[in-house]
Amino acid sequence: MKKVLNKYSRRLTEDKSQGASQAMLYGTGMNDADMHKPQIGIGSVWYEGNTCNMHLNQLAQFVKDSVEKENLKGMRFNTIGVSDGISMGTDGMSYSLQSRDLIADSIETVMSAHWYDGLISIPGCDKNMPGCMMALGRLNRPGFVIYGGTIQAGVMRGKPIDIVTAFQSYGACLSGQITEQERQETIKKACPGAGACGGMYTANTMACAIEALGMSLPFSSSTPATSVEKVQECDKAGETIKNLLELDIKPRDIMTRKAFENAMVLITVMGGSTNAVLHLLAMASSVDVDLSIDDFQEIANKTPVLADFKPSGKYVMADLHAIGGTPAVMKMLLKAGMLHGDCLTVTGKTLAENLENVADLPEDNTIIHKLDNPIKKTGHLQILKGNVAPEGSVAKITGKEGEVFEGVANVFDSEEEMVAAVEEGKVKKGDVIVIRYEGPKGGPGMPEMLKPTSLIMGAGLGQDVALITDGRFSGGSHGFIVGHIAPEAYEGGMIALLENGDKITIDAINNVINVDLSDQEIAQRKSKWRAPKQKASRGTLKKYIKTVSSASTGCVTDLD
C-alpha cells in the first residue's frame, strides 16, 4: 500500500465539502495533479532592512524549485523579523526577544491554518533561529531549517573587521583611540553584503546548535550566505523533505535530550553566545524535553572552549568554512567521545553516519585548538547563583578577563543612564556596573546590552570593570559580564535592591554572585521597594509582559 504523504493537506484538497478551499487553490494556479501533492510550507524570515535577512527570498525560491522537482507543492510565506544590530541601544531592542515567540506563533499559525504537510524554515538573524525551531517543535510535522548563512568579513586598510568593530568604534573614538574619520570608515566597511554577523555571535551560535541537534543539513551553519554551497544546500531541500515525509521522521524524533546535549557541547566548544541558554531552554520546552540552566553548567564543567572566534578571538565563521566547516569540528568531538553519534538527523541518518566521510580539520589550523591545548579548560557559559541571583544568572567568561571580580556597585536603572555615565567619565576601574529593570518584563523584552559592553571595551575598561544585568548580552558582547539575573528587578529581585557602593563578588570558579549585605539589611530594603510602572500599556509588548516567563526558564510565552 502506497504511503500517504499529504496526510494534512488532503483535509482541504480531497474533501468534497471543502470546495471553497479548493477553489482558492485552483485560483493560485494549482492544477488537478497539484491537488494530490504534499504541500510544503517554506517559511522565510525575509525583509530588506538587514544584511542577515535581505537575501532570504532568493533562497526561498531556490528551495521552492527544489521542492517542486520532487513532485511536491511548495508554498512560500513570510514571517516577521527584528534586526538586533539596527535596534541595539534603542527602545527598539524591547521588540527583539519577543520577536522570537512571534515568529514561532506566526509559523505555527500559517502551517496549522493551511494544513501544510511539512515545513522548511529559512531564518537569518538571531531570534529567527530559535523562533523557527520552536514552531517546528510545536507542530511536529516533518521539517528542517536552512540557515541563511554568515556574512563575509569586512576589510579596512587591509585588516578584517565586522559588526562589533562598528559597535566599538564609538567608544574608541570617545577615548581618542581612533579619529572620527576612522570611525566613519569603519561603519561603512564593516558589513560588505548579505549574511548574519560573522563571529560567534547569536545567529552563528544558534546555527551551530541547530546543526548539532540534527535539524539542519551538514555544513548549514558554516556555509556563507553568498556562497555557491548555500545555493547547493537549497537545491537539496526537496529530496530532504520528501525523505522525511516518506520515513515519517518528525522534529520530536530528532530533538531528543541527547541531541540537546550535543548542541550544548558544540556551542561551548565554539565559545557561543549567552543567548543560547535562553533559546535552547525555549526550544526544549517546545518538544517537552526537560532542560534546565543547571544542565548548561554540567556541560560547562566538562567541556573546553576550543574556537578562537570573535568577539573575544580573531576569526569569523567564514574562516571555519574554508577549513572544513562545522562538521569537521563535530567529527573531532565525536572521535573524542564528546557527542552522541547515535542521534537521528534530518538526513534520515545518524549524526555519526553524517560525519563518517567528513574530512578532518587541518593539523596546522589556528581557528580550532586541539583538545589538549584549549583556550579555556572548562566552558565559558557559567551559571552563577547567590543572593544576587537566587534563580540563576549566565556569565560569559572566556578566561581572558579573569574568573573572579570583586568591586563596588555603580547602579543604573536603564541602559541609557549607564551609557551617559560612560560618556561623562563616571564609570571607574573597580566598578561593578549594574544595569537593571531591563529584564523580560521590566525591559520589557530583556534588551541586549551590546552598546554598554562595546563602550566599555572601546574605552579601554574591559579588564577593569564588570557588568551585571537582568537584561541580556549580544553574542558580540565580551568582557567580565553577567546577564539573565533572576528574579529580575521588575519582580522585586535582589538586583532591584542594590545600591551604589555595595560590595559585589562575582566568582566564576565557585559559580557564585553575592552582595555583601546581611539578611536584615536585605529585608529592610525589600520592605521599601515598590514595583515600577509598566513601560508598555498597550499592544504586543503589553501582551508579552503578561505572558513571558523568567529568564531561568527561557522566557517562553506559552507556559501554564
Swiss-Prot record:
The gene is ilvD. It catalyses: (2R)-2,3-dihydroxy-3-methylbutanoate = 3-methyl-2-oxobutanoate + H2O; (2R,3R)-2,3-dihydroxy-3-methylpentanoate = (S)-3-methyl-2-oxopentanoate + H2O. The modification N6-carboxylysine is found at K127. Its EC number is 4.2.1.9. The active site is at S474. Belongs to the IlvD/Edd family. The keyword Plastid does not apply. NCBIfam families: ilvD, PRK00911.1. Pathway: Amino-acid biosynthesis; L-isoleucine biosynthesis; L-isoleucine from 2-oxobutanoate: step 3/4; Amino-acid biosynthesis; L-valine biosynthesis; L-valine from pyruvate: step 3/4. [2Fe-2S] cluster binds at C52, C125, C197. The keyword Iron applies. Keywords: 2Fe-2S, Amino-acid biosynthesis, Branched-chain amino acid biosynthesis, Iron, Iron-sulfur, Lyase, Magnesium, Metal-binding. The lineage of its organism: Bacteria, Pseudomonadati, Pseudomonadota, Gammaproteobacteria, Thiotrichales. Pfam families: ILV_EDD_C, ILVD_EDD_N. Binds 1 [2Fe-2S] cluster per subunit. This cluster acts as a Lewis acid cofactor. GO terms for molecular function: 2 iron, 2 sulfur cluster binding; dihydroxy-acid dehydratase activity; magnesium ion binding. This is Dihydroxy-acid dehydratase. InterPro entries: DHAD_IlvD/Edd, Dihydro-acid_dehy_C, DihydroxyA_deHydtase, DiOHA_6PGluconate_deHydtase_CS, ILV_EDD_C, ILV_EDD_N, IlvD/EDD_N.
